[in-house]
Amino acid sequence: MALKVYNSVTQSLRQVVQVDKSELWKGRPLKKLAKGITKTGGRNNLGRITIWHRGKGHKQLYRMIDFKRRVFDIYATVERIEYDPNRTAFIALIKYDDGKFSYILSPRNLNVGDKIISSDKAEINVGNCLPLEVIPVGTIIHNIEIKPGKGGQVARSAGTYAVLLNKDSGYAQIKFRSGEVRRISLASRATVGSVSNIDHKNISYGKAGRVRWLGRRPVVRGVAMNPVDHPHGGGEGKTSGGRHPVTPWGKKTKGKKTRKNKFTSRFIVKRRN
């Protein structure tokens, strides 16, 4: 997909850069694989804000994506490539030879009419889903399971991928885009190729309103608040906050490690930092 740049007809279009979606499906999603979602605005069941900077955004339908690829040994044909407002990657509607439909993450260079399959004996082609045990070393993969059978959890955003580095003692060493190298069970499955919409990183929204459509509200700096609202608030005139950066609840931020799951740390061969 190419990038789409607009002429400066208005000030809000002057900086806009979007991904050209002219080749995508222009109709509605498949009805039985889509459902409505209720926006919470970042509030919990008590009506209190638990996640800052969340708003309503535009009304959306949630597309039910098959991250597990559990229909084995049956070929599927790519019917169309679609835009999904709930994620940065594009999605593909596939039709299995037995007549069932499913949505999957669309890999890069997957085209309408292509045949894909989820099988232990599948070829190493873009869109095919296989166990890590049978994927050759050096292959680019995405939608990787951390726990066998749980469904893909890693490398699902637009343009992302991981590389299979090594296999040893029942585990595969996978290198992520962050630089982290992690051991994952050879029984876990992954899809060959990288995720579509690689130009997503080059998008420029051009105006605040376009970001509001996505459900994001403005972010206010702590030093611009009052002391009752933030540890950096208050002071006469403009101040720097007078202390090291902290969260609104006084916890150190900007560089402080927040990882809690010590049990799985043993699977990390090389940390991203």
Curated annotation (Swiss-Prot):
Identify the domain of life.
Answer: Bacteria
Q: Name one GO molecular function term.
A: transferase activity
Report disulfide bridges, numbered on this chain: none
Is Transcription among this UniProt entry's keywords? no
Region called Disordered, residue ranges: 224-260
Keywords linked to the UniProt accession: Ribonucleoprotein, Ribosomal protein, RNA-binding, rRNA-binding
- Respond yes or no to whether keyword Metal-binding is given for this record: no
Report the GO terms under cellular component: large ribosomal subunit
Signal peptide from the UniProt entry = none
Provide ranges: composition bias, Basic residues: 251-260
Q: Which Gene3D superfamilies match?
A: 2.30.30.30, Nucleic acid-binding proteins, Ribosomal protein L2, domain 3
UniProt-listed GO biological process terms = translation
Family classification = Belongs to the universal ribosomal protein uL2 family.
| Subunit comment | Part of the 50S ribosomal subunit. Forms a bridge to the 30S subunit in the 70S ribosome.
Q: What does this protein do?
A: One of the primary rRNA binding proteins. Required for association of the 30S and 50S subunits to form the 70S ribosome, for tRNA binding and peptide bond formation. It has been suggested to have peptidyltransferase activity; this is somewhat controversial. Makes several contacts with the 16S rRNA in the 70S ribosome.
Please give the name of this protein: Large ribosomal subunit protein uL2
Q: Which organism is it from?
A: Orientia tsutsugamushi (strain Ikeda) (Rickettsia tsutsugamushi)
Designated gene of the protein: rplB
